[in-house]
């Protein structure tokens, strides 16, 4: 029997299948540099690229990024407008790169809250990458965990009415089937940047058994090494291999 090294163990069994990230700290990062908040949001786009690239190279199956919560509409109107334009620009610029790298893009959340122009761009971007078989990249936009559970419950209510089901017929799997990530594995590792230790209504159903990783780094500073350290922390929590961030980075380079 071939010797099983830590590298084969990591690549075969131990990596999280689904990583979710609350990308926090763009505004604080910008403020520390004496810049407007939008400067931080734009800098955060590069951190997104690095995380997507790292997850894809490692063989993570699903990466879900919390880009815009249902509560973010309460921010100043000019900031929300800039965020929507940035979303449109990034979709236009990045989708071809994602497609080239066999990444499937999905936007999860209440898309009806966006402009028709942005909804069309989302639809065309998702259609372009729909048949890709690599990393599934979920961008959670106008998303909230409570919203997700509510919309799944409404779907289930229709099913109950149509099929004449009773309360005893209802199962967790039936509710799970209506969630925005129904065909994907639940979250194994949830990362939050910028020092806040809460999950802020993000993937409440899917992250029921996730490991929660909090880092003081603001999102624009979260790079390949940061991602590798989070993965190493998860592996040590799950498997107790004594894995290091450097070993994870070595896997990325293979």
Swiss-Prot record:
Query: Which residues are listed for substrate binding in this entry?
Result: 25-29, 37, 41, 69-71, 73, 75, 192, 198-200
Comment on bound cofactor = Binds 2 magnesium ions per subunit.
Q: Which cofactor does it need?
A: Mg(2+)
What the entry lists under CDD domains is as follows: Cis_IPPS
Entry-linked InterPro entries: UPP_synth-like, UPP_synth-like_CS, UPP_synth-like_sf
EC number annotated for this UniProt entry: 2.5.1.31
Q: Which Gene3D superfamilies match?
A: Decaprenyl diphosphate synthase-like
| Taxonomic superkingdom | Bacteria
The Gene Ontology CC terms held by the record are: cytosol
Any Pfam family matching the protein? Prenyltransf
Q: Name one GO biological process term.
A: peptidoglycan biosynthetic process
**Which GO molecular function annotations are given, in alphabetical order?**
ditrans,polycis-undecaprenyl-diphosphate synthase [(2E,6E)-farnesyl-diphosphate specific] activity; magnesium ion binding
Enzyme category, top tier? transferase
Entry binding sites for Mg(2+): 24, 211
User: Catalyzes what?
Assistant: 8 isopentenyl diphosphate + (2E,6E)-farnesyl diphosphate = di-trans,octa-cis-undecaprenyl diphosphate + 8 diphosphate
Record's keyword terms, sorted: Cell shape, Cell wall biogenesis/degradation, Magnesium, Metal-binding, Peptidoglycan synthesis, Transferase
Catalytic site positions: 24, 72 (proton acceptor)
Its biological purpose? Catalyzes the sequential condensation of isopentenyl diphosphate (IPP) with (2E,6E)-farnesyl diphosphate (E,E-FPP) to yield (2Z,6Z,10Z,14Z,18Z,22Z,26Z,30Z,34E,38E)-undecaprenyl diphosphate (di-trans,octa-cis-UPP). UPP is the precursor of glycosyl carrier lipid in the biosynthesis of bacterial cell wall polysaccharide components such as peptidoglycan and lipopolysaccharide.
Annotated PANTHER family: DEHYDRODOLICHYL DIPHOSPHATE SYNTHASE 2 (PTHR10291:SF0), DEHYDRODOLICHYL DIPHOSPHATE SYNTHASE FAMILY MEMBER (PTHR10291)
Family affiliation? Belongs to the UPP synthase family.
Oligomer and partners: Homodimer.
The protein, known as: Ditrans,polycis-undecaprenyl-diphosphate synthase ((2E,6E)-farnesyl-diphosphate specific)
Q: Which organism is it from?
A: Photobacterium profundum (strain SS9)
User: What lineage does the source organism belong to?
Assistant: Bacteria, Pseudomonadati, Pseudomonadota, Gammaproteobacteria, Vibrionales
